[in-house]
């Protein structure tokens, strides 16, 4: 995390350029003004990339949106929750397994049932690991408390690359630059060994303002051993 270093670096910058200015260096003020202007513009766009759509009348492609990682998670939880409801109709309780600590935490936060149970009986778990990969390694495992239950294994797929002519298509408002779903992947071996059956329910799009922002691949896992 670079955040703690930002303020000290600003102080170092001021000390350096103040000394140069006092020594008679030229163009310090013009360069400072240019830097502040460019920085203000970039920060404004980076903190609200929807402005690109308002300025150009074209939404920024999701693959290029730096805010993609912080958007669409409530909708992702809704998509996962809908699949959970379908599996729960089979009559067994359903818990969730995330392939990454990020998606595990996001589902815990945005699914009301998971958020309500997080302190006493967690509903969302991180996939098992032999060594500590994150804080979830130290939490109780679902293998201890959810035997004979069903589960959803959720992982986010990487968005495919934009085609080489995406800029021209984007400029002409041709939706052909919109990316197709990534190919399905097989379930991990450890997951197959833990359940009686593991079924890939498909690649589920997560929309934000009408554009696919994420794809999540969801596996229906039945009867934990």
Place the predicted regions along the sequence by residue.
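A short small-residue
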Residues: 57-61
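Generic hydrophobic alpha-helical segments
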Residues: 11-12, 51, 87, 114
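Hydrophobic/aromatic-rich transmembrane helices and adjacent perimembrane loops
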Residues: 1-24, 31
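Weak global preference for isoleucine
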Residues: 2, 15, 42-45, 55, ...
